[in-house]
Every structure is written in structure tokens, then in C-alpha cells.
């Protein structure tokens, strides 16, 4: 946050909460999902005014897509990446990436 990593104390404390919650899930969470949850809990605890999240995989199915009403969504490029998960054409990948955009989002 503000160019600084999450302090070790907060990382350990929040990490324990995330790991315990993850163990209660029917489907195991991915490492990216666990790290996303940890970051979001830290940002909430720190009462951040603004948080910029980078989508890790596409958009529609990405773990960052839990934000109910983001103010802004930006798609920087549509390349043939993660084709196994997103599709093998630019159109399919664009559709997956557009899944991060929600009503009312600029």
C-alpha cells in the first residue's frame, strides 16, 4: 500500500484468517484467490480511500471480480494469453475480460 508491502504482523494475522476460511470451503481456493482475499481484508482494515486491483486472469471468472460496484474498470489490451482458460480468439478473450465491467462502472 502506497508503495510499501503489507507489514509482516498484518500479513501473518490476516493470513491466518484467510487460511482458516479457506479450509472451510467445499472447493479449495487457489493461491491467487487466497492472496486476493488477504489483500482485500488488509485494504479494508487500513480504511483505504482508493484501491487499484489488477485482474490476474481475464475478468469474468477472476477472483478480483467480487467487487460489487467498482467505480472504474480498464482493459489495457486483448492478446492471445491464457487461451486454455479464456478462449482461443481475440473475440472470446475480449468477452472474458469484459466480464469485469459491471453496471454503473466507468
What is each residue range found by the language model?
Residues 72-79, 101-106:
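Conserved beta-strand/loop subsegment of P-loop NTPase cores
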Residues 1-68, 80-94:
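ATP-dependent carboxylate-amine ligase catalytic core
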Residues 90-104:
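Catalytic subdomain that performs nucleotidyl-dependent activation
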Amino acid at each position: 500500500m502506497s508503495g510499501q508491502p503489507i507489514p509482516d504482523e498484518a500479513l501473518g494475522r490476516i493470513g491466518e484468517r484467510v487460511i482458516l476460511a479457506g479450509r472451510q470451503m467445499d472447493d479449495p481456493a487457489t493461491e491467487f484467490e487466497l492472496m486476493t482475499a488477504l489483500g482485500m481484508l488488509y485494504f479494508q482494515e487500513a480504511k483505504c480511500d482508493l484501491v487499484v486491483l489488477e485482474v490476474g486472469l481475464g475478468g469474468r471468472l477472476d477472483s478480483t471480480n467480487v467487487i460489487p460496484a467498482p467505480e472504474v474498470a480498464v482493459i489495457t489490451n486483448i492478446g492471445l494469453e491464457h487461451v486454455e482458460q479464456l478462449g482461443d480468439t481475440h473475440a472470446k478473450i475480449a468477452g472474458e475480460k469484459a466480464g469485469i465491467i459491471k453496471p454503473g462502472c466507468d
